[in-house]
Amino acid sequence: MTSNSEPRTDRFPVSAVVLAGGRATRMGGADKGWVELAGRPLIDHVLDRLRPQVDEILINANRSQARYQALAPVIGDDNPDYLGPLAGMQAGLAAARHDWVLFVPCDGPALPRDLMSRFRAALTPATELVVAHDGDWLQPVVALLHKSLLPSLTRALAEGERKIDIWFARHQMAVVSFADQPDAFINLNSPDELAAYEARLPDSATGQGATS
């Protein structure tokens, strides 16, 4: 019999949901997925990082849905009032084909290429969710959740909960450090942050090479 503390070693299928449903107020209201970095939309960089790691990709979006649909199936929040990332996670858990669902933001062009392999290594039979840590801070919108959490999340939203970390703390959570990849979860929440990050890229870094 497997102990609840022993890591899982099986290669199970994973769905991924790119969270693109926010208002992006610090980006001047622009749809962040379509803001360009090195000549390509941020969403393209994110999808490049995700495709080799997962078995299904969905995009959670509340606007530009037809445009996103050209890249992957689109799901909107159940509530139209922009309730935050937890609402996107609820929609993703409900729509995903597989039991484990990876969530990432649409403005994460440097997501780790070994994100899922490290998350898998952290799982035990008791684990309900896995969250990334950058060495200084928890990164709650980069997380692997089991679909069995959907009823709990639906209740939390109905009760007015909007804070991811508070809801996460109610469940069996594993935390995985990516301190060795300092840019993995770079914040690109404003035009200034985007420009500063792009300025650090090599002069030749365009297209897919920008996040290689």
Task: Give the label of every model feature segment.
Residues 1-8:
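Intrinsic disorder/low-complexity segments
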Residues 8-161, 166-185, 191-205:
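Nucleotide and nucleotide-moiety/phosphate-recognizing core
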Residues 205-212:
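Long, low-complexity, intrinsically disordered segments
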